[in-house]
Amino acid sequence: MSKTKINKSAKETVKKKNIKRFLKIGSIVVFLFLVNLYVILSFVYQEKSFTVYLEHEDRIEKNLMIYETKDDKRYRYHLKADILDELSAASLAWLPENLHTEADGSHNGNNYIAYTFYAENWWKETINYNAQIIIDDVIRNVDEALRVVVYRNDEKVVYAKPSSTTGEPEEGTKAFIDEKTIMAERIENFEVGQVDKYTIVIFIEGDDAECTDALIGGEIGVYMKLTEEKTVEPEEPQDEDIN
């Protein structure tokens, strides 16, 4: 199983003003984390890939499909994206404001992973589906400084683990649901022909108080899945026998 690894570089200087934690080596002040991020999906552990996968409840019509670009709509159970071998600590303020509109598929930056894909109801009936992002494995509490930004169409939500000191959500974020679940949303009444556009962004927040030397050498695994629900037909009303 491939995992995200957190390492330290003593030869690069963090130049952004809002990174305030530094490590002094000689006359150089440095604070940098390097990350090898991975996401697993679809029963297969893929090294150096970020993947989204699709599930259906048993014995249902497969109405929901996922694809990377509108020019290549093919039914798939999973999508794979490129990742970066190294990812330095970042800040939410550094991220481009147009991440959810700039490109389809992989469009990573120097210090974040970004992947855009589409979910469409392409078949013949209105459905409900669930979207989840789940933490598979954590070593050295790397999730304490993790940020996951989810764009669904034009709606943006930033997810983070609650503060370990106050138990409250970090500023400007929505708290993870629990230790394993970053987010879980149920999309209802998803009509035939309707499309949801997702952009997922993953980075390590350098301004988080938990972003310390203790994370160095840690690992994390995260995956996302979409699950189409079985459609339950309403029962026909029965005439009551009054005799």
Residue ranges and their predicted role:
Residues S2-E97, S106, E229-N243:
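Short, polar/proline-rich extracytoplasmic segments that appear immediately after membrane translocation
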Residues T13-L32, I40-L41, T126-N130, K174-I187, ...:
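Feature for long, exposed domains in two main contexts
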Residues Y38, Y45, Y53, Y67, ...:
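Sequence-level detector for tyrosine residue identity
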Residues I66, E144-V148, I200:
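Generic structural motif
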Residues L99-I127, K180-N243:
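C-terminal, structured domain-capping segment
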Residues S106-V195:
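Non-cytosolic head/periplasmic domains of membrane-anchored proteins
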